[in-house]
Design a protein with these regions (language model features):
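AlphaC helix of the eukaryotic protein kinase fold
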Residues: 45-64
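Activation-segment/catalytic-loop signature of the eukaryotic protein kinase fold
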Residues: 76
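Flexible N-lobe loop architecture of eukaryotic-like protein kinase catalytic domains
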Residues: 20, 57, 66-69
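Protein kinase catalytic-loop region centered on the HRD/HxD motif
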Residues: 118-130
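Activation segment signature within eukaryotic-like protein kinase domains
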Residues: 112-113
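Conserved N-lobe loop of protein kinases adjacent to the ATP-binding glycine-rich P-loop
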Residues: 31-38
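Protein kinase glycine-rich loop
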Residues: 16-22, 27
Length: 153
């Protein structure tokens, strides 16, 4: 189901617009009316039993991760048979877009690499280890403060 801007889910999350779509789901920018913050809302686009199980597992797993280079998951719910994850909205531009616009200095690239090594080390040392499976420039967002965040689990 495609969510239109202005749609309200659970009388709490107001859809502002679509951020992107991947194989597993669509991600929307939304506004949490309760907490008065912007969030990212991921919709499971494959509502079959295996996909639903995997989506719920992802929600539980990510909700327990706390790291500055990873978004936090703050809610998971089912509405009219459709599953949703709510997570931090990460402000900034993805590296794929950024790299197409300007050259990158060695010091910037090293800082970003350091951020990713820290995030991956954190993920891989969990019990059980968390594997991202889709690390690419489009899934790395550069925040205004210069830190990189790994998104789209």
């Amino acid at each position: 189901m495609s969510l239109e801007p202005g749609s309200l889910l659970r009388e709490r999350y107001r859809i502002e617009g679509r951020l992107g779509q991947g194989g597993m789901g669509a991600v929307y920018r939304a506004y949490d009316l309760t907490l008065e913050i912007e969030v990212a809302l991921k919709e499971n686009l494959n509502p079959n039993p295996e996909s639903e199980r995997q989506f719920k597992r992802e929600a539980r797993l990510l909700a327990n991760l706390r790291h500055p280079n990873l978004p936090r998951v703050t809610d998971h719910f089912v509405l009219e048979g459709q599953q949703y994850l709510v997570m931090d909205y990460i402000e900034g531009e993805d590296l794929q877009s950024l790299l197409g616009k300007r050259p990158v200095s060695v010091s910037e690239a090293l800082h970003w690499a350091d951020d990713m090594v820290e995030a991956l080390h954190f993920l891989h040392t969990r019990t059980p280890p968390v594997i991202h499976r889709d690390i690419k420039p489009a899934n790395l967002k550069l925040q205004p403060d210069g830190n990189l965040v790994l998104v789209d689990f």
